[in-house]
Regions:
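Ribokinase/PfkB-type carbohydrate-kinase core domain
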Residues: 1-6, 60-73, 85-169
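Generic detector of contiguous secondary-structure segments
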Residues: 14-15, 122
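Short polar catalytic/cofactor-binding loops
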Residues: 7-12
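Substrate-binding N-lobe of the ribokinase-like
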Residues: 2-3, 15-81, 88
């Protein structure tokens, strides 16, 4: 099964603990699926900066044998970073620097690749809504992760048109 994490990826940074790690909902889901579904053929379609955090994302994916051929590396760009805090045992998103994800759009070649996947994961953390119809035009199934964005203006449109979605309330 071909599966791609498409769109927003980032590095979670816990400054007070001196810990950082590559993540994003699609990356997390993909890594977990890789542990559960041995036949999964994983890939990621996203953008990173040419900074240390971007290198960390690439290394984490390559270590897990994820196809990174559709990761756009933006020269001089800042990889998306989410500064995290711990409140007891709960993680709290403190501050987000979306960096290169703000203007990110997949290339034509990226879109061709996306349409060859059996499943993709994506979410509202980037400008994806207008691309969804094209992404599924050749049968790719979309796992759409709304997380806590159940009031986003695009929710009704997406719910009417796509197969798999997830809310975290």
């Amino acid at each position: 099964m071909r599966f791609a994490a498409v769109g927003f990826t980032c590095i979670d940074v816990y400054k007070n603990l001196n810990i950082s790690y590559p993540t994003g909902n699609g990356i997390d889901l993909m890594f977990n699926l890789m542990d559960l579904v041995p036949e999964l053929v994983p890939s990621v379609v996203t953008a990173i900066g040419d900074d240390a955090y971007g290198q960390s994302m690439l290394e984490a994916c390559q270590k897990r044998k994820v196809d990174t051929g559709h990761v756009t590396i933006v020269p001089g760009g800042q990889t998306a970073v989410i500064e995290m805090l711990l409140n007891g045992r709960d993680r709290v998103h403190h501050r987000a620097e979306k960096g290169v994800m703000i203007p990110y759009q997949p290339t034509g070649e990226d879109m061709d690749f996306i349409r060859t996947q059996d499943y993709i994961h994506t979410d509202l953390s980037w400008n994806v809504t207008g691309l969804l119809k094209d992404m599924r035009s050749k049968g790719t199934k979309i796992y759409f992760d709304f997380s806590k964005r159940y009031r986003h203006e695009d929710v009704p449109t997406i719910l009417k048109k796509y197969q798999l979605w997830y809310f975290f309330i």
